[in-house]
């Protein structure tokens, strides 16, 4: 019995091997995007060049001509295969005057926001006590948002704001609370019950955000 107990950690280690990243056992593992993603990331490309480790997609401003007047340009594993297995990714955030990134979460990564232009008001809410931490950020300032916590950013200035964002995972995921509640086909009667909003308010928000039901 004692011997069996001692063998358990070894057996568990072997079971977990398929879910560990190849980048942990070799220098890197540039994603082969022609293959399917797995819990351990994408399989490695057979042939790799210097271009796999550089990405130029964040040089141009995103299109902020939309409802929230903001745009996120990602450099996740799907756009930048070189980050596969490294536990990192990046993005560019553009927020026009009056723009906002509504309350949202990244279920698979923490976020580090670095403001390069303009003024950004930002904050997050803790999961247990609902404590709110807010800050107004200027060019050169940074703020961290812990993984999975609700947070927001909005332009608090009179000119366009730009920020570079780093994530602690190759594909951080995104769920915007407003869209999750009102841009779907969940029946309005249920939304009313779970949000304490009345029928008119729910239908208005569903109409604005493209929901149905």
From Swiss-Prot:
Cupin type-1 domain location: 56-203
Keyword Transport set for record: no
Claim: Ribonucleoprotein is one of the keywords in the record: no
GO CC terms: apoplast; extracellular matrix
Alphabetized UniProt keyword annotations: Apoplast, Disulfide bond, Glycoprotein, Manganese, Metal-binding, Phosphoprotein, Secreted, Signal
Positions with a binding annotation for Mn(2+): 104, 106, 111, 151
Entry similarity comment: Belongs to the germin family.
Function according to Swiss-Prot or TrEMBL: May play a role in plant defense. Probably has no oxalate oxidase activity even if the active site is conserved.
Full protein name: Germin-like protein 8-14
